């Protein structure tokens, strides 16, 4: 007897696995990832042949959107999934530049929403009870954002509410705003990290201990503790998200004729800090 699935999940990387863990207790999840090479995950059947992907009403897209050589965001895998599959409702969790969902809806005539992901690969345990998204468990997130036409976002809110319950905020907006908020967040975190790197150098030049300075600064609750640790041997920011996303939003708004001077300086300062401390 053929197994009946509720939701198809495209992509089983870090974000895809978090979405799978979130949904699995309430829905039958069909996973498709032809490039998955990780360890087997108990309870997850990972399909690699697109021809045997069953049609489900809902599909969640969690595929990579890497940075191209010209620093733009490569959305080709997302677009391929949506154009070459057949589902009633799509939710994109991959980070994509503003305007992508709107363009895909126009070109494919499909019902697509976007939801920024808040799953992180950081090294530190984040106290989710302090208004921060839990780094690995979406069931502990206190908000979920859905962008798109209201008829489509309402469907996805219904899917999510059956898992998350009544406690979180379910915010609905247009897709471009939902896409941009992810870039605003990561650009702010990158800027804050460079700001703290700069003040580390300022403190050093004045004979002041940065960690002592930092703790006094953080007595003001408006500052926030994230991104304030500085390691002399590894300065600036790195990883899979911040460099990619800051570069991508810079390139995207340049296409609209705007010069994001602050973010460009953040990238230049980051390169300087990285070059000075890495072998």
Name what the model sees in each region.
Residues 19, 41, 70-71, 100-103, ...:
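Short glycine-/acidic-enriched loop or helix-start segments at secondary-structure transitions
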Residues 146, 150, 185, 189-193, ...:
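Short-chain dehydrogenase/reductase
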Residues 175-179, 190-279:
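Interdomain hinge/lid region at the active-site interface
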Residues 63, 87-89, 95-178, 249:
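Rossmann-fold dinucleotide-binding core
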Residues 1-51:
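NAD(P)+-binding Rossmann beta1-loop-alpha1 motif at the extreme N-terminus of oxidoreductases
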Residues 46-89:
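Rossmann-like NAD(P)-binding element
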Residues 32-34, 47-49, 113-115, 172-175, ...:
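Conserved beta-strand termini and adjacent loop/short-helix elements that scaffold enzyme active sites
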